[in-house]
Each structure stands twice: as structure tokens, then as C-alpha cells.
Regions:
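Residues forming the flavin
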Residues: 1, 6-266, 270, 274, ...
Length: 346
């Protein structure tokens, strides 16, 4: 998905779309309101881009750890385009003196519904030919809690898609979503996430405090089933009870990787004296958002909707400040992209 095409007077996004088409993406992305490449097409496209970089004299290093040495690298010009999950790089660069600051972000669960239900909500009663012409339906929903002001919203909605285990550290688990180009899976999924404030994890005390919180939640998710993706029905989440093979509803999970049924309620639950105690309002806020979305999409809050968790990495919890010349406080080091906290989302 390449949806964020706003605030782009210089045509950078158009350049990227044309580049993807040149490496195998469907030309329809040049005119679609919500252009979508597809994970399967993207793999081939990135491979072609990599080969072109190498043909032009560039080097690609796999299975290689990035390190920064203030003495060794002081005269280099480095574009730092790390992703928001490059936690070891954040830690090393912070120790080297790179200025960083905590920021607000959002976390939650990946929620699955039947794609046919979403299509019926969006298109109404249409014949099969019309439905095929329209393609799998996509939604975007938002809600602001009247109780605490937190936002609840959908993120990275994947029509006809799959939930994937996107963990990158031992003993921790996080999920994401994806769609193949055809978007022909049985389920629709999206992250339904709740805003996380810097004050929730004492971001003023340490700029990497958000990463520490992410790790805590991912460890809890991992421990539920020993690394398998934990799944719970929305009805059981509301009732604060475990989902089992016997109690799961009619929606079959569409998950790439191993999964099992469990109970997600305690992932965001903390003792009253915990520095994360303010997150005890997460579950109630999540439910409030789901019930609000029911008024926009009938069946969204159905009892057998499936929650998978935890979705902890929707955006970077860190920003690397930079000047008008885009340079950081370290001369020659230019942070950009999601890992720098300036570009994020879909």
C-alpha cells in the first residue's frame, strides 16, 4: 500500500510509483486512489531494484550488522535510513551521542473479519460481477475516546489479507498484516490501535523509553503461547476470558505462521505502582473504539471477530531531530525514513 501521498509538491511519490511500475508493479497504481503493489509483487520488484543498484556500482550487504564509530566515521556522509525496529542501532547511536527524543505512537491488535462482510457493508447488495469489478473492500475508521481523549483507529488495512508474525527479537512477538496482489484471502484484517502517549512510558526520562515498553508487551505476547501468535475472539476479550478451540466462532484465522487460541487482556494490564499503570485504560478504550466502529460497519464488533497480538510497531517511538539541512547533531549523519520518526504509516 502506498497511500500517504500528501504534502508532496516536488513529486517524490510519483517518482516512487513510476519506479515500482518499472520493476513489475501493476500500472494501475499510477491512477488508483489507494495504490497497492502486493507482497508477492514487491519481492520481485525489490530484487530488481537491488540488482540495478549493484549494476550501478553499489553494494548490498546481507547478514551484516551496522555499526557506527564516531572516530572512524567522522568524515563520512551517511544517510541513516534504518527502520523503526532497528533497536540495536538506536542504542548504539544514542551511546555515540546522536540526539534522540521520545514521541507518541500507537499499539493494539490485528483484527480479522470475513472479507465478504466488509464488502457487503461497503457495497451493499451487488451481483458477483459488480463485486469483482469493485475489488475487495477497504475501510478506514477512527474514534476519539470521550473518557480519556485517546485515539482509536484502523491502520494498515489489508483486504483479502493475512496476519503475519513479524517478530525480530528472541523471546518477543509482534504481528503485522499483508495482502498479496490478488487480495483474494477469505478475511480482511487491520490493526486497531490506541494512541500511546510519551507520558505513558515516561518518555521525558529517556528517549528510548518507548522501545522498552514495546519490548515488555512483545515479551508478554510471546509468553502466552511460546512464540505462536495468540488469537482471541472479540467477545471473549470483552468478557476477559480465554478463547479455546471449543469457543471460537465461525471465522477461521488467516495467519501466516503458527498460532493458537489464548487471552490477550493482560498484555496491556499493569500493577498500580508500575510506570506503565496509565495503560490500564487501554482495554476499555479499545472496546469503546470497536463498539463505535460497529455504527459505521455492521458486524465490526461481532462476537467472533478475531484479535491477534500484539501489534506494537505501527510507527517509530523515537524521533531523531535534524536541522534545516536535514543533518542530525552529528555532522555528516542524515537520518530519514521511519526510523528517524519523520515518515511513517502506509
Amino acid at each position: 500500500k502506498l497511500n500517504t501521498l500528501t504534502k508532496d509538491p516536488d513529486g517524490r511519490s510519483r517518482f516512487i510509483l513510476n519506479l515500482f511500475v518499472g520493476y513489475g508493479a501493476d500500472p494501475s497504481i499510477l491512477i488508483d486512489a489507494k495504490p497497492h503493489v502486493g507482497t508477492d509483487r514487491l519481492v520481485d520488484g525489490v530484487r530488481g531494484i537491488r540488482c540495478e543498484i549493484e549494476a550501478l556500482g553499489g553494494e548490498i550487504h546481507f547478514h551484516t550488522k551496522f555499526t557506527y564509530d564516531p572516530v572512524r566515521d567522522k568524515d563520512r556522509k551517511i544517510i541513516l535510513a534504518i527502520g523503526h525496529s532497528a533497536r540495536d542501532s538506536y542504542e548504539e547511536l544514542y551511546a555515540a551521542g546522536l540526539h534522540m527524543e521520545a514521541k507518541d505512537f500507537a499499539m493494539g491488535f490485528r483484527v480479522q473479519h470475513p472479507q465478504a462482510m466488509i464488502d457487503a457493508d461497503l457495497y451493499g447488495a451487488v451481483d458477483a460481477e459488480t463485486r469483482a469489478a469493485l475489488g475487495p473492500g477497504a475501510y478506514k475508521v477512527t474514534h476519539t475516546s470521550a473518557k480519556n481523549g485517546r485515539g482509536v483507529y484502523s491502520f494498515c488495512m489489508c483486504p483479502g489479507g493475512y496476519v503475519v508474525n513479524s517478530s525480530s527479537e528472541p523471546g518477543r512477538l509482534c504481528v503485522n498484516g499483508m495482502s498479496y496482489h490478488a487480495r483474494d484471502g477469505k478475511n480482511a484484517n487491520a490493526a486497531i490501535i490506541v494512541s500511546i502517549r510519551k507520558s505513558d512510558y515516561d518518555g521525558a526520562a529517556h528517549p528510548l523509553g518507548g522501545i522498552a515498553l514495546q519490548r515488555t508487551l512483545e515479551e508478554r505476547a510471546y509468553q502466552l503461547l511460546g512464540g505462536r501468535v495468540p488469537v482471541q475472539t472479540y467477545g471473549d476479550f470483552k468478557a476477559d476470558r480465554e478463547t479455546t478451540e471449543e469457543t471460537v466462532g465461525s471465522i477461521g484465522p488467516e495467519i501466516r505462521g503458527q498460532y493458537g487460541y489464548s487471552r490477550l487482556n493482560d498484555i496491556f494490564r499493569f500493577p498500580a505502582d508500575s510506570p506503565y499503570a496509565s495503560l490500564n485504560e487501554f482495554n476499555e478504550t479499545f472496546i469503546e473504539g470497536m463498539e463505535s466502529f460497529e455504527h459505521k460497519l455492521h458486524g465490526f464488533a461481532r462476537e467472533d471477530a478475531l484479535l491477534c497480538g500484539v501489534e506494537a510497531r505501527t510507527s517509530s517511538p523515537v524521533r531523531i531531530p535534524r536541522g534545516e539541512d536535514f543533518c542530525s547533531n552529528i555532522p555528516g549523519l542524515y537520518p530519514c525514513g521511519e526510523g528517524a520518526g519523520y515518515a511513517g504509516g502506509i
